[in-house]
Amino acid sequence: MHMADALVAPAVAATMYVCSGGVAGFSVKKVRLESDPKKIPVMGVMGAFVFAAQMINFTIPDTGSSGHLCGGMMLTALLGPYAAFLTMIGVLLIQCLLFADGGLLALGCNIWNMAFYGCFLGYFLFWRPMMKKGMSRGKIVGASILGCVVTLQLGAFSVALETLASGITDLPFSVFVATMQPIHLVIGLVEGLITAAVLLFVYEARPEMLSCSEERAKSRFSFKKTIAILGIAALVIGGAVSLAASSNPDGLEWSMERLTGSTELENDGTGAHAAAEEIQEKTALLPDYGFKNSDSTFGTSFSGIAGSAVVLIVCVGACYAFRFFKKKKS
């Protein structure tokens, strides 16, 4: 559901940068107040895990479409909404700059659509209320599926609203919505099941790692071992499983193709669009998750491993930076 720059007018892009930036600033303040040092490695490893998982497009049968995780609901269940939102920003920023996945002009939109709803609404509407009177396997599955379905529906609807506000006449609003929502309902269901599987593993391994958990049962694995398993899983998913990803267009591309006959629209190539495109051409060392001018599968594997590592470093580094400046001010 990564939007390209051609789908967004500069005014809409600026508005969404302000909205996403405001939430990010508020989240930084909240994260600075947190004192749990174990949250830092979880941010890094789970950021890497979500990055790798987003490389895996799964086929939606009988549609010609595919989908992939957003990851906001998974992260918010582990980190809480504020750290989860900042982690998602790290993932989306690396995808945009290093891999040209999603437009730079549209980054504010993508952060809002893919991170805000999952991290904040997923937490405050589903995760926290459902875990309030105790955590169980059934509640984890229910919250995961409901949270992913609803927040992905909101994200898909926001894409349509942003194209409407941008004056993209090639994508008539009512028809675009009618195409986007059903396919993302299916994608949301699959993401909910995957999210539930990961969270159930954590629940069995280290239940206290889950947000809102008051579990005091004996843990199956140590904290370090649990983090190591998730980290290794991220590397395996990014380096190997990504090779088996579906080549079908994702939900957004599929919807566009149904309406316009193409998975992409051309921007006007001037002004803000041209500037953003020029920047991405310089920063995207591994465009489309591969080496430039090469179809080598090694490029995909390298991108998955390298991207996961960069996201881990960025998330952990940013968190330590927040804490450093907090200590300096105090």
Report residues per predicted region.
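Glycine-rich ThDP/TPP pyrophosphate-binding loop and its adjacent helix/strand module
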Residues: 143-150, 158-226
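Alpha-helical membrane segments and adjacent membrane-interface helices in multi-pass membrane proteins
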Residues: 54, 58-118
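Aromatic-rich transmembrane-lumenal/periplasmic boundary elements in polytopic membrane proteins
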Residues: 233-281
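Individual transmembrane alpha-helix segments
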Residues: 1-4, 277-316
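Short helix-perturbing small/polar motifs within transmembrane alpha-helices
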Residues: 115-155
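Interfacial loop-to-helix junctions that mark the boundaries of transmembrane helices
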Residues: 1-13, 36, 63-65, 105-110, ...
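Hydrophobic transmembrane alpha-helices
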Residues: 2-10, 20-75
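Hydrophobic core segments of alpha-helical transmembrane domains in multi-pass membrane transport
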Residues: 16-29, 49-54, 120-125, 148-160, ...
